[in-house]
Amino acid sequence: MKTIECKAPAKVNYRLDVLRRRPDGYHDLRMIMQRIDLCDDIRISLSETPGVRVACGKEGVPDGPGNIAWRAADALLKLSGRCTGIDISIVKNIPVAAGLGGGSSDCASALMGVNELLELHLTDEQLMEAGSKLGADVPFFIFKKTALAEGIGDKLAAVEAAPAWLVIVNPNLAVSTAWVYQNLQLTAGKDEYIIPRFYGSVSDICAILANDLEKVTIGRFPVINQIKQKLLQVGAAGSLMSGSGSTVFGIFAEEAPARKAAEKLSRESDWFVAAVKTL
């Protein structure tokens, strides 16, 4: 049976502003989102056995309907009207519940892969619309560009950002996004700030690094602030928590100092550490 293999990249947030709470309980956001080459490995196959099956084997990642990649494949299979099966294998290289969008990226890969396997010929816009019903970050991974994301993250506009190397550090802590938002104290006045659409250098990127969720997560997990400081000490031009945490990244202009910093932090801790480049 036909099979597709693909990479599902992680993301970081160069900026995350929480503007207001919406009547539906969600929040209006404004974010700069950047894909990186830390990827899950996805394999999607057609099967003669009807239904959708997801195999992962990673603690904290469900295999059935609790996995949004499963729900993505199930939705498109029902849309096709075909009595066939879809098997999805996920090798998790992206830390789970870490602010890197791994689950959303897996979901986006499932939508794009199943669309191809079943020859549905859905456009990226149609896939993004379907993805927005499954997870706020899913459309971004179908968009495949550095983006200014607004609304709940589903309104996307392309942004130009200089290539960079990042050192990703995760202290092996899973953070509940819902808990972070529930404990967030909103501040007024964010709407007036104009987000640039062009970042010609790492210095330009560092100038807009900010995350409204940091204070909440650091309040519960002070190690996140310690990691931010360590990244600056080993040469990062700037450091920031990604998403709701607990991953922190440091930004570098060149590969060699990024790899050197990652090696040093790996030797000194039992944290997940990786030097990655932007996509």
Swiss-Prot record:
It holds the Pfam family GHMP_kinases_C. The active site is at K11, D137. GO terms for molecular function: 4-(cytidine 5'-diphospho)-2-C-methyl-D-erythritol kinase activity; ATP binding. It comes from the Bacteria. It is an enzyme of class 2 (transferase). It catalyses: 4-CDP-2-C-methyl-D-erythritol + ATP = 4-CDP-2-C-methyl-D-erythritol 2-phosphate + ADP + H(+). Belongs to the GHMP kinase family. IspE subfamily. This is 4-diphosphocytidyl-2-C-methyl-D-erythritol kinase. The gene is ispE.
